[in-house]
């Protein structure tokens, strides 16, 4: 038995030795195969390079490798592209860009370049044009090929070696552009968007393969894409969350600048910088950058931009006006900012700027701002004089008459005189009335209420509400409820205070007002519920206990009612004592 076990052990050892020898041999063979494969690839590349015509060999120097990413940094794909302009303009396939948030770019040598902006896209022909910032740009000239001619598909080195092919059919689309059906052995869909060149090294199109169908679409079609002002809202380009370039035309660029506000904040900022770089003599870019800086709380940068605008803009009046207007809006609370305004921003500074604007180019709008600033300085007589002079000019603005009425009110004019100006402001509004006329109906409505003409006031306030449907806050409905109470319009008042409660459910005073009004219209149960809600929101709110107590006494809960009224008295409510005396 022992001898048998020893023999078996020897047999196992011999088998393991043979297996080890076989394994080592296989490893050597695999290593040799990998080496041969690598050598084969290098030889293939070398042989392909030697097989290419001289003009084709240099095409690779014009290629780019694009890597597209989503917002979270996930890589979407790797795409070939090619330069067609010395200013960094390139073309590629469009589909890989859809859903993309950023693009990494490398040139033929592997050096990183910066993606700048989209210059056009077509999802039907699957082409896009864009710009990159590169240290060295070698654009290809565009050319053509005829049926039967030899062509080459040339991707970046990172995506493979050039592949020779042939034009099967040369056709046209959109009248003047070429479309080629190709036969390219060894090509695949990973080369979609790669350059297809003729034997002169001219770019005839971009390669596409779908199934077994191979083709090239004329790069001239993408070259001729033109961005306009409305391109910022182009539904195809907006499928990629990438910046869209500015047009070359000033007028179109101004439109694009306004629409670029809907892009990502970083892209919007880049568009503003591009605008300032392209059109340093226009005020629009500096003003846009000012508002962007104010939104970020960089108030010093906002001031610097306004100063830069004054220094660089060709229309000095516009630049000074913008400076004055921004200061005025900020100091009067019409433009919110983070932090404190620059120390130099005063109403005197604003007035000086707008006076310089008017001196450079007298305009109604400049004089109007001048009057508004003087009013904000509480110089009401001087402001009124200027507003009156503006009222004699064209265009006749309802705002001017409203501001005259405000001056008169500050100077102590009688109600009839103020009302006459407010009626004039409504009279000069465009008809049929639109939302722009709402402020003038509102101001006249408040003046009617001040004069005790509550029903006329209600008509104007209803118009104001109509023009602002869905945009009014609880404070408006509370204000109108107070006017309705004075006019003894209790049902309308109740509806408005309940609307205020719905819009501001945590505002205890609105619920207390609702409870008080319920008592006035003899609805004690509803009054009690409103009061309980007040106490729930704020247990230390004395009016809530007073209203609850009064409601309870009317609901035959006298003991509880008196207890709550006494609690309101103890909490400092001055009305509680008079109610207690009546009850006792």
Protein language model annotation of sequence segments:
Residues 85-126:
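Catalytic-histidine neighborhood of serine endopeptidases
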Residues 295, 329-330, 376, 410-411, ...:
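Register position in tetratricopeptide repeats
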Residues 53-56, 205-267, 271:
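C-terminal cap/linker of serine protease catalytic domains
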Residues 1-3:
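Short, small-residue-biased leader/transition segments that mark boundaries at the very start
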Residues 52-57, 136-181, 186-192, 207-217, ...:
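Flexible, gly/ser-rich surface segments that form the specificity/activation loops bordering the active-site cleft
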